[in-house]
């Protein structure tokens, strides 16, 4: 077994009979001097160092500010294929798209279709309209309606949700008695009279039947395309139980549609 000396790096045996004198050169290790600058030994002879140029701090700050603005307001066309910033909406755009603020109509939370909202146009196309003289609207307006049009109503799921909610509201509190708006009286006791609403899409006034719901104020106060049924005499045709001699036999939910007399 051999031990190595730290100074001479000479192997020294632990046995006395195998000991030999060290023959290596003794070296003294010193710490390198602390210097801030050291000459470049690999510099090509004949070349001199460049003189240090004066840097203006104001110009440097201006360059940094321009770089930050260039990075912040970069062009719309970028090399990256996907930029999530393009799909971010501001708070104003989010409020416009929200159903609570769409057309300032509280009934939009029930119906989210574009043409069921009272803030949309009654026409279902963006093409230019034909003149009233050449269109079918003049001919249809002059002839009497034998069969009432198909009513605008909720689908099965929305209707079930609304009925359950209104029934729960009617069980908790006593609903007020209100004078019928269209002169329609529900034969079933314990319910409120029929309440109608004016649709801006079709320009007609519809009477709701079989729904224990009443809202204070007119549903459509923003845009009134037709006057209320108080001013125009209407004929409320019941479609709940059509008679045998009815003009149009149409199986639909309980809805009363007005027909304006020419």
Curated annotation (Swiss-Prot):
Q: Name one GO biological process term.
A: cell differentiation
Principal location listed in the UniProt entry: cytoplasm
Say if the entry is tagged with keyword Cytoplasm.
yes
Could you name the Gene Ontology cellular component terms for this entry?
axonemal A tubule inner sheath; cytoplasm; cytosol; manchette; mitochondrion; nucleoplasm; nucleus; perinuclear region of cytoplasm
Say if the entry is tagged with keyword Mitochondrion.
yes
Q: Which GO terms describe its molecular function?
A: alpha-tubulin binding
Keyword list, A-Z: Cell projection, Cilium, Cytoplasm, Cytoskeleton, Differentiation, Flagellum, Mitochondrion, Nucleus, Spermatogenesis
Q: Which family does it belong to?
A: Belongs to the SPMIP6 family.
Q: What PANTHER family would the database entry show? A: SPERMATID-SPECIFIC MANCHETTE-RELATED PROTEIN 1
Q: How does it assemble?
A: Microtubule inner protein component of sperm flagellar doublet microtubules. Interacts with alpha-tubulin.
Name this polypeptide is given: Sperm microtubule inner protein 6
Q: Which organism is it from?
A: Macaca fascicularis (Crab-eating macaque)
């Amino acid at each position: 077994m051999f031990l190595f000396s730290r100074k001479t790096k000479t192997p020294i045996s632990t046995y006395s009979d195998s000991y030999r004198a060290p023959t290596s050169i003794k070296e003294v290790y010193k710490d390198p001097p602390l210097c801030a600058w050291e000459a470049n030994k690999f510099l090509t002879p004949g070349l001199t160092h460049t003189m240090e140029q004066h840097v203006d701090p104001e110009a440097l700050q201006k360059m940094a500010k321009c770089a930050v603005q260039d990075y912040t307001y970069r062009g719309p066309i970028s090399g990256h294929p996907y930029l999530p910033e393009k799909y971010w909406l501001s708070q104003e755009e989010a409020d416009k798209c929200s159903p609570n603020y769409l057309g300032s109509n509280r009934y939009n939370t029930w119906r989210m279709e574009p043409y069921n909202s009272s803030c949309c146009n009654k026409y279902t196309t963006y093409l230019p309209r034909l003149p009233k003289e050449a269109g079918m609207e003049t001919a249809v307006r002059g002839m009497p309606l034998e069969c009432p049009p198909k009513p605008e109503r909720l689908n099965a799921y929305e209707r079930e949700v609304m009925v359950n909610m209104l029934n729960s509201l009617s069980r908790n509190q006593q609903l007020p008695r209100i004078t019928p708006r269209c002169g329609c009286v529900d034969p079933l006791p314990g319910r409120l009279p029929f309440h109608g609403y004016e649709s801006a899409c079709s320009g007609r006034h519809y009477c709701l039947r079989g729904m224990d719901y009443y809202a204070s104020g007119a549903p459509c106060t923003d845009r009134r395309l037709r006057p209320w049924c108080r001013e125009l005499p209407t004929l409320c045709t019941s479609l709940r139980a059509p008679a045998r001699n009815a003009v149009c036999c149409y199986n639909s939910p309980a809805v009363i549609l007005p027909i304006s007399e020419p």
